[in-house]
């Protein structure tokens, strides 16, 4: 209560003192008579650094003692340490086993973690049926616990599951009710989600807008990075509030300082483009690097293009390729397309048709119309690879279906290009339109995907949590 300011003013020093006393009591009780509960409590406090220095290694030892006595709470907590590799060597299989032992004793939090692991195939084989069963058990368990204790964290979790249809039928109305309960006592995550729900209503009334903005500001005061980022986006775009880039930058900075890589990416973009702020390449690089270090694929792509072009920073092809490959490995179709073009043209690196085809195909299969168009030309021209008219038609068709008029041109005249020289003449006629395929092309919704689905889903969930639309790629093909 002293730490959280419940019933009194928050006082971290006083709270530490109380935790220290509590820890001493647990140690004394354990010395007198070893007990799984005290071992668990000591392990949790040491892991969190409550009343003592944080020490995951020591925490793992205490939790292991308790878990070996089949204490479900310790099994769950120890499973988390193994999952994240804190105090122990990371081992998803052991984490899965510990979560299973805990879940089999009807602990809903363990069931929830098992659901995620089974869904993603982490530490086990993918099993969507079993994942759904575990999620349903988790949901029912959370409902039971919430009815007994009316905990705001449980209310938020239940709202999230109802909103996303995890372990239960999707029900936005019920989700909103849970968020409202949690927001009443100031739960920052609930405040944030509730604000997003309110603002998503196309027929929203002015008084509701003010209510939503109030929830967002309340969440920002509680240092919620997602709320700060979302509110920053509203100010940047001038949605529901007067456009104010300075306020957007302030909120993005707060969010980034609270470790939000998307906010850091936006800051990098703003400072690099001088969009409403004084252009500051040094600050842009600093924030983009901050985001890239946290595996943000858009920041990795942005840095890759920067170092490849060498306009605002000294050209560094090696660095550029490193960042582009990191971004491409996370399924960024724009990075895949750019790498394909780099290896195809052989201007900054040794020409590598095999690598070019690999990256272009990866981008094309995600629906990148420029990669599809490029592949169509490659298969038709018979210059770097054997001619494959069927493949050319397939890629041109996919590109044209997205409105690519140049792909449509080739489809309309496909039989006229029997002689490569005629084809070359045709492409020269279209040369003045080639800027459409330059790096400033806007992203389009992909009809399919090839990249690692687990990586893409994690990124998508992370973006949606921060208020992005499902098909919002948060970037164009250039900076």
Predicted regions and their residues:
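Hydrophobic face of amphipathic alpha-helices that form TPR/SEL1-like repeat modules
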Residues: 1-4, 39-48, 77-84, 113-120, ...
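Non-Sec secretion/translocation targeting segments of pathogen effectors
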Residues: 450, 457, 461, 465, ...
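Short helix-capping/linker turns of helical repeat alpha-solenoids
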Residues: 4-6, 25-27, 32-35, 39, ...
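TPR/TPR-like (Sel1-like) alpha-helical repeat modules
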Residues: 20, 131-140, 390-405, 409-419, ...
